[in-house]
Amino acid sequence: APFLADTRVRFLEIPPEQARRGKGHVLNAGYTAVTRSELAEPNPENVVVVVFDADTRVEPHFLRAVAPYFRDPTVAGVQSAVRMYNADQKLLTLWQHLEFAVWGQVFCKAKDRLGSMTLGGNGQCVRFSALSSLGDEPWQTSSLTEDLDLSLRLLSKGWRLRFCSSVAVWQEAVPRLGALVRQRSRWLQGHVICWQHLPALLRSRLPVFARLELLLFLLLPIVFLPIGLTSIANWLHVLFSLFVGDWNYWNYDGDWDYWNTVSLLTWYVLGFGMAPLVVVAWQQIDRPPLWRLLLHSHFFVLYSFVWFAASARVYLQVLLGRHAWFKTSRREREGAGAGGVKTKRAAAALRRRRHVDQEPIQ
């Protein structure tokens, strides 16, 4: 690769038998290499480790955007926003783009304010001294979600984590439904494994609302399935009412009254509760046409069934005692690599950000 010709770049090669042991092993190998070099001397608190996936496209001003957060010595890490550069490939990849838009623009901003922000696996920036406070191998190799595990241990030790919404990393959305469900079930199972950190989190000095949010966040695997079953029952009831002619669902007797309105609003919240959040988040990052915004924000409800299926798979995996790790395949066809996939959305977003000063950070 051309960038390897830069004298500032150091290439670390890991034997295949070690690289296939999981992302945590690879990250720890990189951490060890930095520890043994002069890079972390003499001020490790001023050294920041940045983690990108292999298929990531990084916006030019990434470092300039995240660096100011580290002026606060209590900040251990910063997470950037995440976008999908193949969102235009199919409906499934667009929904993942919307999913990460809502996660970043709504939930991560809220978590940042509460003090319960957690790091992701891509676009993750961590202070070297914070990693050192976790021991010789900061990333847990036994965890299915090493990023979440790292975040919870840092928060338990009193470190702060922040979210930077002004810059994003662009990654490839998973184009196949089966691979996507497997990936999401691995994430949820990783949440279950991270329950081991709950006692330390609840005893920590984190704000009360931060601890409560983290508790609810970690319990997501067990609530997705009941919520999914409730949602399915709600939709079946509505469809039965519409096609069979049983309008009792709306309590409709010829005159529209207060309770008819309550029934309609209840159905909308249960069926399309995420739609307003999608509208807000998508409008902020892409500004799509109004018709597309309203249409896809409501069709996005179908994407929730990916999480319901993933939750059911986690129940099964836990009952069977399985904790296997599988690398998620994002390739739908040979040759559709990260460098070969270009979309109007990713290109337009990168063009909008070209005006940012790109001088190196000292």
Model features per residue range: what roles?
Residues 4-44, 61-144, 185-196:
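Long helical/loop segments within the catalytic core of UDP-sugar-dependent glycosyltransferases
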Residues 46, 54, 146:
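Short acidic donor-binding/metal-coordinating loop in glycosyltransferase active sites
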Residues 49:
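Short aromatic/hydrophobic "clamp" motif used to bind/position activated sugar donors
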Residues 53-57, 154:
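The conserved acidic donor/metal-binding loop of glycosyltransferases
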Residues 99-105, 181-201, 271-278, 313-315:
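Catalytic core of nucleotide-sugar-dependent glycosyltransferases
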Residues 151-169:
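Catalytic donor-sugar/metal-binding loop of nucleotide-sugar-dependent glycosyltransferases
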Residues 165-179:
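Active-site donor/metal-binding and catalytic loop motifs
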Residues 216-320:
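Membrane-embedded multi-pass helical conduit in multi-pass membrane proteins
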